[in-house]
Regions:
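Active-site bordering "gate/hinge" segments
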Residues: 1-225, 233, 258, 325-343
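Short conserved micro-motifs at the rims of enzyme active sites and ligand-binding pockets
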Residues: 221-222, 278-281, 312-315, 339
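Short N-terminal helix-initiation segments at or just after the protein's N-terminus
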Residues: 40, 100-103, 168-180, 208-210, ...
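Internal helix-turn-beta structural module
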Residues: 286-341
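Dual-mode signal for accessory low-complexity, basic/Gly-rich regions
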Residues: 223, 239-305
Length: 343
């Protein structure tokens, strides 16, 4: 019996690599581990070849130094087999584009920054097939997120409020605004398919965050069942109050025994209008990274743990996606009551 599973993905991967500006004669490395999806490897390989690139499929041993299960959490440092192998690193540095199909990627690994400094573009892909296809980005998405980045760069404070009691003030000085747009088209750029979001890395934030029923805790991939109030001072979660999810978070911080586990890291808002908030409920936890929740248009996304701008390395990484918030940047609302505002 023939395996045709990659055929349906070939068109999507080809369109995606075009957005990544893969051209004839470029060198593309498709990076995988034994647990990676074979149909993704085949589709990425075929797409790169169809666009005239030189393509190599490189499979390295699995295994991560992260204490958490390294399966689509967004918290891992990458694979030991790459972190400890300069030959593998040199291969990635020599490529024009790396299509990273590993389970966890190298999002929080210093070696990724070395690869990017070599001019390599990196595209990380790991969500389920229909999630990728439904959220295939558009070239115009880049201008949308860049407008948000420019607003953050020119502003001093971001305020987040909600009807259930969130009231957080964020100092934007030195917060290094960034974006994800779902494709890696510039030399030295990392991006994630799918994703469309604006984010920054502030140091100081004060107030309270109130999680409402239906907000999403990642990487647990669980919906909040009862309200949780988080008291924030100087960018640190001082206390979590509420029901089962509050106890879950307090236990997570205690068990992590991590210096930076309670500290906030990146935060921002989603612009991916094709995202499905209910995807988290419809798939197995091992099938999703959870980008529908992270990049959902009009969400407020914030996180804990690793903070590269401040030099904080941490495995205690949470992403929490909230709906129903109003996000204003120096008085300009970019999200109103959970609805994305685009001018």
């Amino acid at each position: 019996m023939f395996d045709f599973s990659s055929v349906d993905l070939l068109d999507a991967f080809t369109r995606e690599l075009r957005l990544c500006k893969v051209t004839e004669g470029e060198h593309v490395v498709v990076l995988s581990e034994p647990a990676s999806r074979g149909d993704y490897v085949a589709a990425a390989f075929g797409a790169a070849k169809a666009l005239g690139a030189h393509v190599i499929a490189a499979t390295v041993p699995g295994g991560s130094p992260a204490p958490l299960p390294s399966t689509h959490t967004g918290a891992g440092p990458g694979l030991r087999s790459v972190l400890a192998d300069t030959t593998a690193q040199d291969l990635l540095k020599s490529a024009d584009l790396v299509v990273d199909l590993t389970q966890e990627g190298f999002i929080h690994a210093p070696v990724q920054q070395e690869i990017l400094r070599a001019g390599t573009r990196i595209l990380f892909v790991c969500d389920a097939p229909d999630v990728l296809v439904r959220n295939l980005p558009d070239e115009g998405d880049k201008q949308r997120v860049l407008r948000g980045v420019e607003l953050l760069k020119s502003s001093r404070t971001m305020r987040v409020t909600s009807a259930v009691g969130t009231d957080l003030t964020v100092q934007l000085a030195g917060s290094r605004p960034e974006f994800q747009t779902g494709f890696a088209d510039d030399p030295g750029r990392w991006d994630h398919w799918p994703s469309t979001m604006v984010l920054c890395w502030p140091e100081l934030s004060d107030g309270r965050i109130v999680l409402a029923e239906g907000d999403i805790l990642l990487p647990f991939k669980e919906y909040v069942q009862s309200p949780v109030t988080l008291h924030i001072a100087g960018g640190r979660i001082e206390k979590a109050e509420g029901g089962a999810e509050a106890r879950l978070l307090e236990t997570f911080f205690a068990d992590a025994d991590d210096e930076w586990g309670r500290h906030l890291s990146h935060m921002g808002w989603g612009l991916m209008r094709s995202a499905d908030w209910f995807a988290t409920a419809m798939y197995g936890k091992g099938d999703l990274m959870g980008m529908d929740a992270r990049a959902f248009a009009g969400n407020f996304l914030w996180s804990t743990g690793p903070h590269p701008v401040l030099g904080r390395e941490s495995y205690a990484h949470l992403d929490i996606a909230m709906r129903g918030c109003t996000v204003s940047v120096d008085g300009t609302e970019v999200v109103t009551g959970g609805e994305l505002v685009e001018r």
